[in-house]
């Protein structure tokens, strides 16, 4: 997801462009929280799916007013759909607590589904054992 796509997603969730600083701040808060709570906590899972024992989460680059629209959000693809929901939660937090709560609930539901999928045992083969 690019910065432009994220902005469009946040707009689709009802937030307008009147205050770009709020959109930028909300996006940065969402990206940082997802990195700290989901990406780092599930490093082994991402190492496995990327088949890279050296995989480490990158520290996300902070979005600013100068950030190019084509800038790719630095969150693993599996978790990227969480970013607009959490950013919308933060964007609405001061103005409309009901909307903020609704987006938090949607974020939390999707997050729980993704976490359950990440901790579900992957395909495994068992070899050996005791013969009769």
What is each of the regions a protein language model found here?
Residues 1-72, 113-132:
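Conserved short "hinge" loops at termini or chain/domain junctions
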